[in-house]
C-alpha cells in the first residue's frame, strides 16, 4: 500500500533524518528511531509554519521511508562517505592471524570505526621545522636544560627513518619503562641539587646573624666575673627554664625612671584638677558681679520713682518747703557745677524777671477789659456765670492770692540730678 506524502510529512521526515542520519554503521538503528517518531506525532511534535492539519491514523514503514529518501539522495555514496577508510587500515595482527580468536571475530566495520577515532584524536601542536627551525635552535642554545632534548629528537627522527616501525603495544611498554627510569633519576638528584647548588634565602640570612651572635657571646664571656660563672655552673643542675616562659617582675620592685614618671603623672593630674576648679569658679564670680550691678540699677530706679511720686503728691505748702529744700540742694550743686559761669546765670535771672513783669502787665490789662465789658453789657444778657465772673477779680477773690515773684512755679523747672551724681559730689 503506497502512502500519500504531504508537505507536512516531508518536513517531519527531514527534521528527524537530520537528527538521526540513516547512513554508516548504525543506519538501521537510526531508521528505527525515525519510524517511531513519524508514527507518533503527538508524542514527538514538530513546530510548523503552515496551518495545514495532519491526518491521524497514517502509518509509515521503514521501506516507505527508504524509498522516499532514495528519491532525493544517493544512499550508496552517503555510506561510502561515512566509511571513508578502507580495509587496509586494519591491524597487522588481524591480517596475519597472530592475535587471539576475538580479534578475528570482530567485524570489519567496527575496526573502521576504531581507526576513525584514532585519526580524529587531537595531537600536540608543533611548529614546522622549515620555517621556525632557526628560532628553535637559538632557544635551545640559550636554555641549559633543553640542549639535551633537541639532539635526542633529531637522533630519534634519523632512527625512525632507518628502523622499521614497531607495534603499538611495544611502544607503550618502552614509554612506561622510560618514565620509570626518569622518575628514579630525578628522585636521586633532588637532595644533591638542593644541598649543593641552591640554598634557600632563609639559610642565607641566618649566616650573618649567627656570626654576630657568636661575637657578642665572646665579648660577654670576657667581661663576666668568676663568681657569675660559678653561679651559672650551679644553676645548670637545677631544672631548665623553657625559652617560651618569661619570668614576671614583682610589683614592689620599681626602678628610678619609673618612680620619676609616676611623680610627674601625679603632678600633671593635680594641675589639671586645679585648672578645672578655677574654670568652674570664674563663671560664678562673673555671675555674682552681674547680679550686683542689676541690684544697684534697680535701687537707683526705685529712688527716682519715689522722688517723682513724692513731688507730685505733696500739697502747696509742703511742696513749697520741699521745693525750697530742693532748690537749696540744686543751688548748692549748681554753684559747684557752674563755677566760672556766673554771668550766664545773672543774665538768665534778668530775663526771668522781665518775663514775670510782662505777664503781670498782661493779666492786669485782661482784667480791666473784662470789667469794662461787664459794665457795658445789658442786664438781660447777663447770666449768673457772667455776672459772677464779671464781679469777681483776681484782686477781690479771697482764695486766689498773688504768688511771690521768687516762687518755684514762676521759675523755670529745675533739672533732675541722679543719685550717682549726688554721691560723687
UniProtKB/Swiss-Prot annotation:
Protein localization: Nucleus
Compositionally biased tracts (Basic and acidic residues): 149-163, 172-197, 204-231, 270-309, 333-346, 354-380
Pfam families noted in UniProt: Eaf7
InterPro entries in the record: Eaf7/MRGBP
Biased composition (Low complexity): 386-396
Location, primary (coarse class): nucleus
Gene Ontology cellular component list: NuA4 histone acetyltransferase complex; nucleosome disassembly/reassembly complex; nucleus
Phosphoserine: residues carrying this PTM: 200, 225
Polar residues bias: start-end ranges: 408-418
Composition-biased stretches (Acidic residues): 255-269, 320-332
GO BP term, example: regulation of transcription by RNA polymerase II
Top-level taxon of origin: Eukaryota
Keyword DNA damage attached: yes
Span list, region Disordered: 143-425
Oligomer status and interactors: Component of the NuA4 histone acetyltransferase complex composed of at least ACT1, ARP4, YAF9, VID21, SWC4, EAF3, EAF5, EAF6, EAF7, EPL1, ESA1, TRA1 and YNG2.
Note from the entry: Present with 300 molecules/cell in log phase SD medium.
Protein name (record): Chromatin modification-related protein EAF7
Species this protein is from: Saccharomyces cerevisiae (strain ATCC 204508 / S288c) (Baker's yeast)
Amino acid at each position: 500500500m503506497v502512502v500519500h506524502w504531504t508537505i507536512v510529512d516531508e518536513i517531519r521526515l527531514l527534521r528527524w533524518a537530520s537528527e538521526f542520519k540513516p547512513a554508516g554503521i548504525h543506519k538501521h538503528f537510526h531508521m528505527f528511531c525515525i519510524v517511531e517518531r513519524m508514527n507518533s506525532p503527538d508524542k514527538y511534535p514538530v513546530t510548523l509554519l503552515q496551518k495545514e492539519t495532519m491526518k491521524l491514523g497514517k502509518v509509515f514503514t521503514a521501506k516507505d521511508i527508504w524509498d522516499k529518501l532514495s528519491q532525493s539522495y544517493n544512499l550508496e555514496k552517503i555510506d561510502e562517505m561515512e566509511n571513508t577508510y578502507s580495509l587496509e587500515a586494519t591491524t597487522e595482527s588481524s591480517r596475519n592471524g597472530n592475535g587471539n580468536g576475538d580479534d578475528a571475530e570482530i567485524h570489519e566495520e567496527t575496526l573502521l570505526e576504531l581507526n576513525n577515532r584514532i585519526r580524529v584524536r587531537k595531537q600536540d601542536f608543533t611548529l614546522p621545522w622549515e620555517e621556525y627551525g632557526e628560532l628553535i635552535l637559538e632557544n635551545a642554545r640559550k636554555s641549559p636544560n633543553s640542549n639535551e632534548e633537541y639532539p635526542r629528537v633529531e637522533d630519534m627522527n634519523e632512527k625512525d627513518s632507518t628502523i622499521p616501525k614497531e607495534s603499538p603495544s611495544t611502544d607503550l611498554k618502552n614509554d612506561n619503562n622510560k618514565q620509570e627510569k626518569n622518575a628514579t633519576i630525578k628522585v636521586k638528584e633532588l637532595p644533591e641539587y638542593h644541598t649543593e647548588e641552591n640554598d634557600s634565602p632563609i639559610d642565607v640570612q641566618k649566616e650573618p646573624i649567627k656570626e654576630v651572635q657568636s661575637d657578642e657571646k665572646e665579648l660577654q664571656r670576657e667581661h663576666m666575673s668568676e663568681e657569675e660563672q660559678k653561679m651559672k655552673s650551679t644553676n645548670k643542675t637545677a631544672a631548665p627554664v623553657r625559652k617560651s616562659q618569661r619570668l614576671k617582675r614583682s610589683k614592689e620592685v620599681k626602678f628610678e625612671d619609673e618612680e620619676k614618671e609616676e611623680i610627674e603623672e601625679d603632678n600633671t593630674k593635680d594641675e589639671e584638677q586645679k585648672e578645672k576648679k578655677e574654670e568652674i569658679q570664674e563663671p560664678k564670680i562673673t555671675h555674682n558681679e552681674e547680679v550686683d550691678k542689676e541690684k544697684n540699677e534697680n535701687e537707683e530706679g526705685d529712688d527716682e520713682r519715689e522722688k517723682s511720686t513724692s513731688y507730685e503728691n505733696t500739697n502747696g505748702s509742703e511742696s513749697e518747703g520741699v521745693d525750697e529744700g530742693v532748690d537749696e540742694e540744686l543751688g548748692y550743686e549748681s554753684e559747684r557745677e557752674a563755677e566760672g559761669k556766673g554771668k550766664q546765670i545773672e543774665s538768665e535771672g534778668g530775663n526771668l524777671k522781665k518775663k514775670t513783669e510782662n505777664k503781670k502787665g498782661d493779666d492786669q490789662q485782661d482784667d480791666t477789659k473784662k470789667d469794662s465789658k461787664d459794665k457795658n453789657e445789658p442786664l438781660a444778657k447777663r447770666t449768673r456765670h457772667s455776672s459772677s465772673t464779671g464781679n469777681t477779680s483776681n484782686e477781690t477773690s479771697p482764695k486766689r492770692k498773688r504768688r511771690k515773684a521768687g516762687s518755684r512755679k514762676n521759675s523755670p523747672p529745675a533739672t533732675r540730678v541722679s543719685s550717682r551724681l549726688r554721691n560723687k559730689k
